Amino acid sequence: MVHDSTDDPDDTRVRKSRRGTALDAPPQETAPPDLDPATTGGDDEDDALLPDILEESGAVGEEPLASGHEAIERAVRLAPTSPGVYRMLNANADVLYVGKAKNVKKRLSNYARQSAPQPARILRMIAATVTVEIVSTNTETEALLLEANLIKQLRPRFNVQLRDDKSFPYILITGDHWAPQILKHRGAQTRPGRYFGPFASAGAVNRTITALQRAFLIRSCTDSFFESRSRPCLLYQIRRCAGPCTREIDFPGYTTLVREATDFLSGKSHAVKQELAGEMEKAANELEFETAALYRDRLAALSAIQSQQGINPRTVEEADVFAIHQEGGFSCVEVFFFRTGQNWGNRAYFPRAEKTFTPEEVLGSFLAQFYDDKPPPKNILLSHEIEESELLANALSIKAGHKIEVTAPKRGEKKELVAHALTNAREALGRKLADTATQGRLLDAMATTLSLPHAPKRIEVYDNSHIQGTNAVGAMIVAGPDGFVKNQYRKFNIKSEGLTPGDDYGMMREVLERRFKRLINPPEEGAKVKDDDFPQWPDLVIIDGGRGQLNAVREIFANLGLTQVSLMSVAKGPDRDAGRETLFMPEREAIKLEPRDPVLYFIQRLRDEAHRFVIGSHRKLRKKDIREAGLQEIPGIGPSRKRALLHHFGTLKEIERASIADLGKVPGVSAESARRIFEYFHPQPG
């Protein structure tokens, strides 16, 4: 979708049930991206997950079933005959199911009839129901939107759940500066400018922006960097920016470049390419071969964008295409995004649903949740007819302020797009099923090797990072039956003031106490939930270190009263060689595995992923401090050398990128000063 900036979208949120949340199972990190190979889809955001199947248990007992019917009958007596949303809750106040109805009393009466035949899934839900809560709405469309919002927030066990629900990135060409900037944008579209999207992934946006810079030479630097320039930056030298900061291009010329880029993203690619081709031919005829070569390179960059996009439909201007494939009790929904006649990528989703749900039921519930916080396009194309397509179209039309069509095309190019998406869904689910089976065997082997009571479903790995105690941060990663679950990674900025700089034990103590106290003492009803709140107990906790670190964590666990969580530490081998690690567990001898043991390789991957994540978190903190402090914090760098460095390189970012040799070329900067500057920007964190 292409549009100017808008007001903040409705940010209404519903409190999540503390007990009834079924959190996602993790993705396999090495799984092939669930993308059309011919598109610029989200290979770097492939966090699609396979959920646990909710297995059907045996026959439902007559007594709990009768009790559930009685609870629903009580609700029927008070239920309105108007539209609304109802929630079924169990004895722990967990939300089991969220539903909507045009006539709530009539819908609940269907559940209350004991003689009516019901699927086993519905009978289990009724048997667990203790109370029913009802919210009346003015219209059925309002009920549909509220139902989708509640399902996303409460994650009821018996509903279809959209789980990997990241916001989509857009390309923004700013409108609040005389020299507009091009950048990636997520979230509320409040900054003035033109927004182009959604794109399937950050990777798709980054590649497109890089190609657009080559084609249209639009700046990507921030306004503060722009204003501080005294000479063009490196991007100007490599022909990815026109250099408006130092007036290498005048205002009319830069405005023309911005207009061409906007036209290209708005679907006028053919006209833009024709214009550039005409300018190239004109320059060649006038023997301006260097200028002609510049136009040639710009045309090549535009062709590269279009070649990456794969399918670009002729008759579909704006649409999202949804195709669902089911196999082995799992569902995969593949989504393609088409805007301005261009393919802006695709993404695979693996919604959580009982295996008795039909493709139509899964897809219908998925769509309502998908567009709960996203602007819908004019056309939504489906692989299957859903029951309430007209109601969904009306609800989305009201929300968007323009007509939305929801159809399952039977012929023509739209049908071809759906068929292509269905092929991708089938292939993505096949890959994910294979990866899940492999991961399951690996976890079984891990349980056998480490003598765990069962194959771990949730593994948490902890690490911390700092430089002489500064910018100290701890981190936790999570893995399980499907690999790494990145949406449950957490970082912990170390807050304890009494810690000795570099006290790794103290940092780990703070991290673990903050993590597990949340599980031991859940927040009160209505309490604000913080980033490190998530109610799942791990089966195995892994830390980096030897027997000393293990004993320190055992003491922390003992003080917290934790006895049921398995604990292991991983000590690096001699010379930090991979494959020579030693594993330590409480009350056991040290464990040495063969270097080629798949379990050891898996443990190495877990440790390395935790290290990667914590180092990345540490570097973000350090870069923030560097931006705020500038060069003042570097020993021996006074005002005169600071001015010389900024005059030579232009910005702090360019100084950070410079090598020791480049730094040594600055007048007044000695070899020792160059080394100190380089080490300041490129430290080795602990």
Swiss-Prot record:
Main location: cytoplasm
Gene Ontology terms: biological process: DNA damage response; nucleotide-excision repair; SOS response
One term under GO cellular component: cytoplasm
Stretches assigned to the GIY-YIG domain: 81-160
Keyword Methyltransferase attributed: no
Start and end residues of each stretch annotated as Disordered: 1-48
Pfam families: GIY-YIG, HHH_5, UVR, UvrC_RNaseH, UvrC_RNaseH_dom
InterPro entries: GIY-YIG_endonuc (IPR000305), GIY-YIG_endonuc_sf (IPR035901), GIY-YIG_UvrC_Cho (IPR047296), Hlx-hairpin-Hlx_DNA-bd_motif (IPR003583), RuvA_2-like (IPR010994), UVR_dom (IPR001943), UVR_dom_sf (IPR036876), UvrABC_protein_C (IPR050066)
UniProt feature, compositional bias: Basic and acidic residues: 1-14
Highest taxon above the source species: Bacteria
Domain UVR: 270-305
Keyword vocabulary terms for this entry: Cytoplasm, DNA damage, DNA excision, DNA repair, Excision nuclease, SOS response
Cellular localization per UniProt: Cytoplasm
Keyword DNA repair in record: yes
Any GO molecular function: DNA binding
Regions that span the bilayer: none
General function of this protein: The UvrABC repair system catalyzes the recognition and processing of DNA lesions. UvrC both incises the 5' and 3' sides of the lesion. The N-terminal half is responsible for the 3' incision and the C-terminal half is responsible for the 5' incision.
Protein family (similarity comment): Belongs to the UvrC family.
Record's subunit section: Interacts with UvrB in an incision complex.
Name under which the protein is recorded: UvrABC system protein C
Organism: Bradyrhizobium diazoefficiens (strain JCM 10833 / BCRC 13528 / IAM 13628 / NBRC 14792 / USDA 110)
